[in-house]
């Protein structure tokens, strides 16, 4: 089993502190396994004498814990018997529990209780939790495997990021259960389609009280097809009208918000790099698991390769803690403006640069930016084409770098 070290390192400083540790992310991205790994880390290296309570609220045998107050009473009973020993509470998919916010906050306030929860909806951290915890939580967002993690899981012989592994990653995506399927493409598609259906029904339609699931599915597939391209809700409405499925812009916007909350995809805003202001139109969406997109949209692993490389780079930047926008510099576009703790990096992403014209296009937008922050062009070209103060990197090499 692959240890998700990056996330454990993020959690470790908060173990035992008076904050709820909240792990969020798309369904089946490995939150439950990470929760177990955190428990193992505490038991082995932090507090071997600790008492551990683990409840998965999606499992049928734990259905009694969904009722108001049952988890609270159960944990307090264990804490009372534990005397001076710390009780570590791990609640999986906590949003299914009645009045979970009150229970979690009450347990957090107990001196000898340390609380960890998971959820598959970003709204877990909005009004629901924030109003109760008033800042007493830390959020760790989990994504499917990065390319580096995929290589570690895939390679028994120690190969790192070669052509075969990268093609597999492009084809299958990073959902951790793919490892249990021996990375077989012939059966991975069925699994990913089932995961998609589960997300659509449980995390989007049910939560948003959506009855027209067919319309929802059409909108999601449109977004997945256009991942990495700018488009508007109005363009989706026009597309649906041609498909004889008319709907309003407000409906599309509502459905997109719900899908974003369920981590199906991420919305990225555009930024004017001259006036340094966020633009209100033409956002982009990136798909949380590109393997799921491939099996839903169709085609082989190289279909829409420019879009998918951009997709990979976006999520890698997010994993590394960067806040990412799309840059606009006059009539040109910069794929990513990444900001972190006062640092700014600029990135252009493309498949290959076989001609001078292509190189001029990719480097040209970066050259117009009137500052001296680091600038990068990422492509699959094996030859270093760095020029004019702009660093060129191979995409695979970038994805395999230590977090920077």
Model-derived features: positions:
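Conserved lysine of the Walker
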Residues: 31
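Accessory nucleic acid-recognition modules appended to NTPase machines
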Residues: 183-343
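Conserved catalytic segments around the Walker B and adjacent sensor/switch elements
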Residues: 44-59
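Hydrophobic anchor at the beta1->P-loop junction of P-loop NTPases
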Residues: 23
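Short glycine-rich substrate-engagement loop in P-loop NTPases that contacts/grips substrate
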Residues: 55-84
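Hydrophobic positions on the alpha1 helix immediately C-terminal to the Walker A/P-loop
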Residues: 34, 38
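Interdomain motor-coupling "hinge/lid" segment immediately C-terminal to the ATP-binding subdomain
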Residues: 120-122, 127-230
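Pre-Walker A adenine-sensing motif
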Residues: 2-16
């Amino acid at each position: 089993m692959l240890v998700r070290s990056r996330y454990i390192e993020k959690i470790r400083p908060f173990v035992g502190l008076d904050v709820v540790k909240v792990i969020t992310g798309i369904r089946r991205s490995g939150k439950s396994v990470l929760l177990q790994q955190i428990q193992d880390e505490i038991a082995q290296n932090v507090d071997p004498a600790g008492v551990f309570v683990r409840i998965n609220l999606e499992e049928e045998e734990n259905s009694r814990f969904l009722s108001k107050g049952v988890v609270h009473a159960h944990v307090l009973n264990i804490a009372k018997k534990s005397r001076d020993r710390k009780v570590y509470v791990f609640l999986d998919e906590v949003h299914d529990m009645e009045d979970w916010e009150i229970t979690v906050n009450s347990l957090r306030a107990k001196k000898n209780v340390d609380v960890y929860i998971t959820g598959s909806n970003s709204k877990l951290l909005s009004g629901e939790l924030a109003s109760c915890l008033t800042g007493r939580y830390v959020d760790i967002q989990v994504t499917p495997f990065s390319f580096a993690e995929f290589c570690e899981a895939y390679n028994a012989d120690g190969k790192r990021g070669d052509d075969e592994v990268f093609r597999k990653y492009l084809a299958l995506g990073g959902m951790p259960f793919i490892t249990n399927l021996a990375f077989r493409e012939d059966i991975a598609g069925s699994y990913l389609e089932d995961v998609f259906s589960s997300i659509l029904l449980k995390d989007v339609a049910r939560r948003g009280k959506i009855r027209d699931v067919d319309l929802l599915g059409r909108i999601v597939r449109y977004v997945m097809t256009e991942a990495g391209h700018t488009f508007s809700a109005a363009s989706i409405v026009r597309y649906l009208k041609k498909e004889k499925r008319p709907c309003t812009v407000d409906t599309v916007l509502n459905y997109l918000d719900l899908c974003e909350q369920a981590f199906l995809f991420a919305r990225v805003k555009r930024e004017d790099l001259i006036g340094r202001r966020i633009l209100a139109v033409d956002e982009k969406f990136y798909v949380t698991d590109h393997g799921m997109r491939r099996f839903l949209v169709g085609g082989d692993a190289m279909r829409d390769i420019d879009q998918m490389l951009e997709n990979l780079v976006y999520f890698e930047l997010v994993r590394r803690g960067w806040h990412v926008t799309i840059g606009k510099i006059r009539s040109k576009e910069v794929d990513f403006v990444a900001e972190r703790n006062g640092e700014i990096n600029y990135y252009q992403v493309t498949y290959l640069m076989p001609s001078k014209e292509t190189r001029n296009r990719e480097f040209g937008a970066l050259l117009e930016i009137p500052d001296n922050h680091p600038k990068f062009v990422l492509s699959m070209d094996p030859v270093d084409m760095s020029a004019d103060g702009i660093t060129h990197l191979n995409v695979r090499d970038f994805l395999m770098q230590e977090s920077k």
